[in-house]
Each structure stands twice: as C-alpha cells, then as structure tokens.
Amino acid sequence: MSKKIDRTGEEKLNNFGSKMIISRYNGALDIDIYFPEYDWTSENKKYQHFKNGKINCPYEPRVYGKGYLGEGIYKKSKNGKLNKYYISWCNMLKRCYDPKLQEKEPSYKGCEVEKEFLNFQIFSEWFYKNYYEVPGERMELDKDILCKGNKIYSRDKCIFVPQRINSLFVKRSNDRGKDPIGMSQNSEGNYRVRCRDGYGKRNYLGIYSSKEDAFRVYKEHKERIIKEVIDSYEGKIPEPHYSRLREAMYNYKVEMND
C-alpha cells in the first residue's frame, strides 16, 4: 500500500510572481492555496494548476501595477464583451500610471487614484450609483471640474460629464507653447486671442497690445461660455449631478497659467 502524499506547505510563485503556499492538501484535485502577501486563500483548486502557476489572487495589482479586481459581484466582462464600468476603471488607471500615455498627455503627470478606487469592486459600485447618459453624447469620467486643479481620482471629486462639457476644460499647453492660455503672440509682439465656443469651434476675439488686456477678454468670454454650456444641460443631466456641475462651473475662474 503506497503512502498517502501530503503536499501541505509546498511553495511556488504563480505567473504574476506572487508567493503561493499549499495550506490544505486533500489529493491532487482538492487543495487550498494561501497567498501570504495578501492574506487570502484560494480554495478547492487542482494541484496541477498550482504547479503551472495558474492560480490567481483577486488582490494582485495586475492593472497598470496598481488596480486589482477584488472580490464581489462585479465582473470585468459579460458574454465575452468588456463591461462599461471595467473599461472606465482601466482608462482611469491608464491616465495615472501609464508613462507612455503621460508623454503624449503631460497634464496627467502626477495624477493618482485613491486607495479605494484601486479596488475594481468599489469603483464599480460607485459607477452604478453615479453613471448617467445624455442621449447622443459620449460620457467621460472627470476629476477636476468639481475641484479645479485636483489630481486625485476619488469618490467625492469624480463625476461623469458629457464630452462637450469635459472639452471646455482641456488644457492644450503643448499646442500653445509658452504663451498664456487663449492667446498667441505675433511677430509684432501683440497678442491674438481665440477661444473655442461650446461646440469646439475656435472664435477670433481680436488682437491686443498687452498680455493683460488679451487675457481679460479671453477670461470673460471663456467663463461666459462655460455658464452657457452647463445651462444648456438643464433637464438633460439628472440630479444631483446637474446641480453639482452647475455650481462648480458657475464658480469656475479662468487663470492665466491654466
């Protein structure tokens, strides 16, 4: 009679590099695997999967080295198609932790995701409570309309907005170079002022000899456009999101170094 094998205590790294320890062995088809780094146990697994490193832990930061799926009801896909809230979560992490994207879009350098939002389950629950749609428009996750200059994606600072609203606050510092926002200096040293309207069209606002006068014209025009755009969404954006956006956008102050 052969001696029964007990592989309890056997260790191995999985394909992500996490340490695994067999904490219970009841034959090759029924083992429990402990992940000490995350204090989590995967139950009723096969020994062969352990040997091949194919056992995953839901707390491993597999998305841009930060985000993890966690445990809960929210899944990354359904019927082979990625869920909308998973795509939104991944895009948020990409903006904060993908160096290649930040080289193309420097405004995201220094941005972070709050600890809770690194957990896909928590983000997804927040998504379901706060996501809405405006017919015919693409929705985007914003972090700094409610709080100008904010660099952290968090539950209290983030809000979904139509792309038309979000585009009002896009910083195009790469395009304008060293010139202050809304203006460009011509060969004679004067300042030409242009500002996009609420539909993305760039309007010409004149030429001014001083930077201060040019900025004053741009600031007044831009702040008026911001108010007009949010007013146009009354009845289209549900409450309380509309009131929060309206308050923030009515109080938004354009600054020369934006």
Regions found by a protein language model. Give the residues of each.
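Short, cationic Gly/His-enriched loop motifs
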Residues: K76-D98, E103-C195
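A short, sequence-level motif marking secondary-structure junctions
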Residues: R24-L29, K45-G53, Y208-D213
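Surface-exposed loop/edge segments in extracytoplasmic proteins
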Residues: D39-S42, G200-Y204
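A short, exposed loop/beta-hairpin motif centered on an aromatic-Gly-Thr core
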Residues: K109-K115, K201-K211
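Short helix-coil boundary/hinge micro-motifs
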Residues: M1-S42, P58-C90, K94, G110-V113
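Extended, polar beta-sheet/loop recognition surfaces of beta-rich domains
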Residues: K46-K66, I165, N174, I225-D258
